[in-house]
């Protein structure tokens, strides 16, 4: 008997597993009852196709909520934090439902792969990719909501919310299992051992396990295929169609002929109707030369590929392929640009944050920053607070407009509750409970409030 998950939007899929399998294969509808080992590559690619949609839909969450944007020509807003303040938040509901729809598909592919009598590499890829994608999807959920249902198979039952710690345990277990089935890096377009280790390093960092965060970062760094490039053109090339930048560890290919996903439309659209511009204060400060707390840095290579004062309302990091719009680099096909998930900078900054204000942490930051500035000098010692600010600033510079900032701030707050959020955000107003998004009220009403308790601080 075919079973599926009852959870929010997944109620629409009660037609059975065949409908779900069609959903994960954009071009090749294969009836569930006839799926064979030969179909596994199509199913596996379907998971990555779904991951592309989720990544792009949630792309700006971390910048929007971190006050990194000002309204663009096609949008206006006031208090960004109110976007997730209500239990009826459309953003929270959308991220929740989209994630569990994908988890459903990941579970189905994993079930199919586990049931295959033979298949060799195709089965291994399917298992590894399904586990990796499920871990990544749950990572997106846990850093937003904390407590969420843990689903490792499709079910007709309503599964109660699990504590945040159990969600982290599933993510860790999935990644450790995924690396048994995946292979060493050969292309950034597919999950690999190194992609698993990159996410594991981040998971351990979030959980406060600094030793394992460093360990898995070092496992990635042991692969010398990943190399820094140190010019503005090199940095800009990370985000263009056809890139071969050796900093990339995992990036979704986004090679679609239909239903195209265009990150540039959010902040650099050719028709001038984009939603987001760089926050006005950041335009002069984000990539500025600095001499603070013994740190001296100048000539940030990321400035020109990200912001052009002549087109001051555009964020040009994701080139739109047009001309005469202040673009720094040409993009052969802007509609088929890669969706970058992990790159070498992730590993260095994760490792440095885990090492903290030690000589090792400063050495890691120096090696990283040498590849991002014309000149940089670091002191021999730094206070814990100053080092944290250095790492946060480098994350902000490196990953601006990639949806990271709010989550970096949240991680700093979780690890040190004396971290003053009101000094970071202009319109925070002591609403620390917003660090965890509300459980969507529609989902609670469907599942029952006892099964889906609301996060603290929100109205029941």
Feature map (PLM): residue ranges:
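Conserved, well-structured interaction surfaces
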Residues: 41, 76-145, 157-163, 179-186, ...
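Sec-dependent bacterial lipoprotein signal peptides
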Residues: 1-16
């Amino acid at each position: 008997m075919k079973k599926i998950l009852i959870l929010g939007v997944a109620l629409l899929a009660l037609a059975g597993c065949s409908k779900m399998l069609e959903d994960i294969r954009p071009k090749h509808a294969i009836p569930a009852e006839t799926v064979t080992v030969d179909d596994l590559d199509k199913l596996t690619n379907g998971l990555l196709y779904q991951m592309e949609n989720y990544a792009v839909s949630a792309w700006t969450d971390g910048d929007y909520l971190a006050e990194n944007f000002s309204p663009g020509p096609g949008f206006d807003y006031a208090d960004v934090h109110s976007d997730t303040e209500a239990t009826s938040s459309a953003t929270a509901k959308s991220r929740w439902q989209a994630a569990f729809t994908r988890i459903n598909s990941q579970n189905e592919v994993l079930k199919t792969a586990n049931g295959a009598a033979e298949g060799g590499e195709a089965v291994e890829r399917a298992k590894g990719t399904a586990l990796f994608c499920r871990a990544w999807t749950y990572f997106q959920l846990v850093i937003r909501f904390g407590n969420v249902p843990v689903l490792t198979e499709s079910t007709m039952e309503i599964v109660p919310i699990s504590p945040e710690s159990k969600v982290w345990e599933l993510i860790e277990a999935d990644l450790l299992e995924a690396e048994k089935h995946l292979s060493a890096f050969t292309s950034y377009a597919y999950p690999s051992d190194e992609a698993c280790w990159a996410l594991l390093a981040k998971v351990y960092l979030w959980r406060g396990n600094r030793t394992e965060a460093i360990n898995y970062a070092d496992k990635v760094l042991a692969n010398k295929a990943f190399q820094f490039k140190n010019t503005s053109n090199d940095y800009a090339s990370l985000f263009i169609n056809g890139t071969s930048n050796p900093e990339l560890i995992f990036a979704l290919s986004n090679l679609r002929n239909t239903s195209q996903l265009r990150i540039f439309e959010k902040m650099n659209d050719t028709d001038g109707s984009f939603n987001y511009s760089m926050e006005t204060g950041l335009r002069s400060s984000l990539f500025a030369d600095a001499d603070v707390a013994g740190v001296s840095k100048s000539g940030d290579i990321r400035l020109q590929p990200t912001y052009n004062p002549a087109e001051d309302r555009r964020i040009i990091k994701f080139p739109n392929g047009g001309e005469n719009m202040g673009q720094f680099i040409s993009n052969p096909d802007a509609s088929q640009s890669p969706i970058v998930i992990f790159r070498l900078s992730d590993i260095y900054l994760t490792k440095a944050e885990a090492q903290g204000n030690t000589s090792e942490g400063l050495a890691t930051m120096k090696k990283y920053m040498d590849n991002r500035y014309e000149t940089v000098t670091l002191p021999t010692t730094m206070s814990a607070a100053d080092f944290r600010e250095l790492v946060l600033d480098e994350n902000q510079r490196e990953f601006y407009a990639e949806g990271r900032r709010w989550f970096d701030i949240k991680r700093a707050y979780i690890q040190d509750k004396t971290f003053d959020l009101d000094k970071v955000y202009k319109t925070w107003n002591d609403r620390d409970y917003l660090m965890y998004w509300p459980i969507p009220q529609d989902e609670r009403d469907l599942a029952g409030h006892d099964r889906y308790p609301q996060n603290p601080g929100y109205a029941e």
